[in-house]
Amino acid sequence: MAEEQARHVKNGLECIRALKAEPIGSLAIEEAMAAWSEISDNPGQERATCREEKAGSSGLSKPCLSAIGSTEGGAPRIRGQGPGESDDDAETLGIPPRNLQASSTGLQCYYVYDHSGEAVKGIQDADSIMVQSGLDGDSTLSGGDNESENSDVDIGEPDTEGYAITDRGSAPISMGFRASDVETAEGGEIHELLRLQSRGNNFPKLGKTLNVPPPPDPGRASTSGTPIKKGTDARLASFGTEIASLLTGGATQCARKSPSEPSGPGAPAGNVPECVSNAALIQEWTPESGTTISPRSQNNEEGGDYYDDELFSDVQDIKTALAKIHEDNQKIISKLESLLLLKGEVESIKKQINRQNISISTLEGHLSSIMIAIPGLGKDPNDPTADVEINPDLKPIIGRDSGRALAEVLKKPVASRQLQGMTNGRTSSRGQLLKEFQLKPIGKKMSSAVGFVPDTGPASRSVIRSIIKSSRLEEDRKRYLMTLLDDIKGANDLAKFHQMLMKIIMK
């Protein structure tokens, strides 16, 4: 089907090139229309008219004669034939002739007829069109599908060269045929064309040859291969199959036997080992050998294990990396949570500080308005004639007098001292303390903070025992000193014992 479509396209392009090279003149169109009008009026004169048209050609290119005509009807004509020959061929084929009507210039609409003479429309498969068979001029008709079914050639049977007849092959295209013609070839012809093409012989015929790839060898195809339907657009599927790759790691596959005969003397092959499909790893790398055996050179099972192990290790690496990333993210999240907690604590501390500042400000406001009264400093209750005056110490805390609280220990009140100072022209805050508030002089024969003076009282003996216990003397000596202290009777002996004890300790 693909070769036939290519043929139609090629011939159509040739017609277009011919029309562009030699445009059809108006005189030729009028003569053709007049001839077709005469044919429609006198069908019996078709053959004579056709011969006259062949004798007096108007200069049109033969491939384009059949492309111009009525757009409504008419049987298809063979390239190079006239109108009369078309009707004669129709009578030979058993197809009733149709009257041709003259109309405006345009492309001819072709019709296909079956054996009963009825027009067949809507046919998409060109293999089912009734066409002229062969290249030898035989006028017998054959259908594309019927021909392929009735052919003596067994489809899929390999020839002597090892190729099966699975397609139509390459057929030369004649330059003199019309674009609407469809060529068919017998199975034997296709077989011969494929054989010649495989051997590289040149075709003596004119035209171009479509190259067809050699069909696959059915012997090498896998038994479980599924057939592949190619783009033949026909009812029969091609016998192409999916062939599983026979390449396996570990060994070089054996070569296919060549059908050609050797041109020279052959080499002895007695020592050649038999071909194998797989080879196991038999040598490890050693520094002496200098060769490295890759794990990929093992058999298929070991190679599969190697790839599986490599893939597994890659997956494990990815999992480890993801786990590490997840762990780092968890650490970052924990640190962020701790920062959020610290932020909350800082906010609470700020609030507490603000509250304390408010409390301190409130206390300062209250203290600034408090007046502290000191007893005994006002009007003397025993002297009703005394002048009433405000106590100078009744002031805020911040503005207190430096002589405050001294009136209780001085001989004279502050008021009388101030009046006396004013009369003398100066003020003085100094005064004499009352006798009961004055300190007595320190006695040298009595114990005080200045020194210890032992006496006959129990307190003196307790102080001496404490001095002996807190010293760094040995325990035996401490016990001996305690015994001597208990035997001393009198103040003078006790004072001498104290002096001796202090000398022993200070050594």
Curated annotation (Swiss-Prot):
Q: How is it modified after translation?
A: Phosphorylation on serines by host CK2 is necessary for the formation of viral factories.
- Report whether Translocase shows up as a keyword of the record: no
User: In UniProt terms, what is the effect of altering S86A?
Assistant: Loss of formation of viral factories
Pfam families per the UniProt record, alphabetical: Paramyx_P_V_C, Paramyxo_P_V_N
Keywords associated with the record = Phosphoprotein, Viral RNA replication
Compositionally biased intervals (Acidic residues) = 146-160
Q: Which GO terms describe its molecular function?
A: RNA binding; RNA-directed RNA polymerase activity
For this entry, list what GO says about its biological process. DNA-templated transcription; viral genome replication
Cited InterPro entries: P/V_Pprotein_paramyxoviral (IPR004897), Paramyxo_P/V_N (IPR028243), RNA_pol_Pprot-P_XD_paramyxovir (IPR016075)
- Sequence segments annotated as region (Interaction with N0): 1-48
Cite the residue spans of the region called Interaction with the nucleocapsid (N-RNA): 459-507
| Positions of modified residues (Phosphoserine) | S86, S151
Chain segments carrying region Disordered: 41-99, 134-163, 201-230, 252-273
Q: Which domain of life is it from?
A: Viruses
Task: Name the residue ranges with Low complexity bias.
Answer: 134-145, 260-270
Effect recorded for S151A: Loss of formation of viral factories
Where are the annotated segments for Multimerization?
A: 304-376
The UniProt annotation puts the region (X domain (XD)) at 457-507
Q: For the region Interaction with the L polymerase, what residue ranges are annotated?
A: 361-377, 396-410
- Domain notes per entry: The N-terminus consists of a long intrinsically disordered tail. The central part contains the coiled-coil multimerization domain (MD). Forms a four-stranded coiled coil structure. The C-terminus constitutes the alpha-helical domain (XD) that binds to the nucleocapsid (N-RNA complex).
* Function of the molecule: Essential cofactor of the RNA polymerase L that plays a central role in the transcription and replication by forming the polymerase complex with RNA polymerase L and recruiting L to the genomic N-RNA template for RNA synthesis. Also plays a central role in the encapsidation of nascent RNA chains by forming the encapsidation complex with the nucleocapsid protein N (N-P complex). Acts as a chaperone for newly synthesized free N protein, so-called N0, allowing encapsidation of nascent RNA chains during replication.
Per the record, the similarity remark reads: Belongs to the morbillivirus P protein family.
This protein's assembly is summarised as: Homotetramer. Interacts (via multimerization domain and XD domain) with polymerase L; this interaction forms the polymerase L-P complex. Interacts (via N-terminus) with N0 (via Ncore); this interaction allows P to chaperon N0 to avoid N polymerization and non-specific RNA binding before encapsidation. Interacts (via C-terminus) with N-RNA template (via Ntail); this interaction maintains the P/L complex anchored to the nucleocapsid template during the sequential transcription. Interacts (via C-terminus) with protein C this interaction allows C to associate with the ribonucleocapsid.
Protein name per UniProt? Phosphoprotein
